Design a protein with these regions (language model features):
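Intrinsically disordered or low-complexity boundary/linker segments at protein termini
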Residues: 1-19, 80, 133-152
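Structural beta-alpha unit
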Residues: 2, 75-109, 146-152
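Small/aliphatic-rich secondary-structure junction motif
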Residues: 2-52
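Amphipathic, non-transmembrane alpha-helical scaffold segments
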Residues: 17, 59-67, 124, 128
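General small-molecule cofactor/ligand-binding pocket signal
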Residues: 38, 85-89, 140
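Acidic, proline/glycine-rich short linear motifs
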Residues: 39-68, 147-152
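Short beta->alpha linker loops
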Residues: 41, 65, 88-92, 114
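Gly/Ser-rich helix-loop-strand patches that form or flank binding pockets
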Residues: 100-150
Length: 152
């Protein structure tokens, strides 16, 4: 029997993240696992705006704001009896997810199948796909509710 002690769930604060979180919470409750919630700030989206400003100070402030937001999110969405580790890091999402999973010896990653849409998805690829290919542990990819496969 597989016993999960550490589960990682990347969060992007979307409604879809809430659905994905339900799966992660369910697994954590079943095995009394620690649930690691991770929010990755992709600073590449801010780089143009930050070039002329004090970059480190702004990055630190953004990280602090996102950590506060993640903790608020956790208290609204998760029961008190689940062990939680809330992490906010800066970097490339799939790289950070894999790095955190290795550093913390994560037993399973639970994440959504889609974050980006449209041209961003085409240009940058799927974070979930990259994580599934490179992760050191099993990855459960939760499909977005209401999405159906259609053959054109």
């Amino acid at each position: 029997m597989i016993n999960l002690e550490k589960i990682l769930c990347p969060i992007d604060f979307s409604e879809y993240s809430k659905e994905t979180l339900k799966y992660a919470v369910s697994f954590a409750m079943k095995d009394e696992a620690t649930l690691f919630l991770l929010h990755v700030i992709d600073m590449r989206t801010f780089e143009d705006d930050l070039e002329a400003i004090r970059v480190k100070q702004i990055k630190d402030e953004i990280t602090k704001q996102h950590k506060s937001r993640l903790l608020d999110y956790v208290t609204k969405e998760i029961r008190n009896d689940i062990k939680i580790e809330a992490l906010v890091v800066q970097g490339i999402p799939f790289v950070e997810i894999i790095d955190i999973s290795k550093k913390n010896k994560i037993d399973m990653i639970v994440m959504g199948s889609h974050g980006r849409t449209g041209i961003a998805h085409i240009m940058l690829g799927s974070v979930a796909e990259k994580v599934a290919r490179k992760a050191p542990c099993p990855v459960l990819i939760v499909k977005q509710p209401g999405r159906k496969f259609a053959i054109p």
